[in-house]
Amino acid sequence: MKKVVKILRGIGYLAAFSLILYPVVSNYINQMNSTTIATDYEQEVSHLSEEQENAMIKQAQDYNESLIGIGSIADPFSESNENQTEDDEYNKLLKIDDTGMMGYIDIPKLDVVLPVYHGTSEKVLQSGVGHLKNTSLPVGGESCHAVLSGHRGLANAKIFTDLNKMEVGDVFYIKVLHHTFAYQVDQILTVLPSDTDALQIEKGKDYVTLVTCTPYAVNTHRLLVRGTRIPYEEAQKIDEEVGLQCTIPFNLILLIGGIVALIIIWVSIKSHKRRKEKKHEQNN
């Protein structure tokens, strides 16, 4: 009987440790997959000729120009966006393969590299960041405002889970074909889903806004983190300054906390067992 109890206790420890490790391991695997996706994307881009790339950028710029003066913009998480994948003309823009990926976003502050896909259907948002149709494609330029949306709290990926940690002054990068565009956060808003005024194009401005649901797991509002275009070299300097600050990754904190919790549980069980044995000896 004692042997069975020990086996069950061991299984319990293993299950508890697995639950603690799951988010850490899951996020690590997701980050590795994202890095692989980015590498594969750049490999595909390397096969494009200069003429092909220039033509793709020109098509994207023409699309962006056609959006100037457009009316209202839909909520990125609206069910109406499910049909966006049926627009063949839109899906051909910046297309280099059949994945639907138009580029990727690198957010150093959040330690994530995420693929950016056409549209904001649920299928897209389960695997990466979605570009909101009828907003500018992320190729830079005056009078452009790209809107990129991502989920929070997915079991198998962070995506925009930590977007609330972004602060004014932080930088992020958009990689499209051979171009890298740098943006610095200049505005953070929390709005109702129907309030999309802050996503409109502003004459002469070059913006990218990152959108997710908030509060976490409640999702009644939208968190809008807007970045304005800055020179790449300037963004690199900001990154270097931030890099000098000593920060401990959240996953490491979670892992250490989990191990400490298990040790405390183990010590408590051992202490309880000793007291029980001692009491038994005294009674005898």
Q: Predicted regions span which residues?
A:
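C-terminal single-pass membrane-anchor helix
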Residues: D239-N284
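Solvent-exposed, non-transmembrane regions of membrane-associated and secreted proteins
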Residues: K2-I248
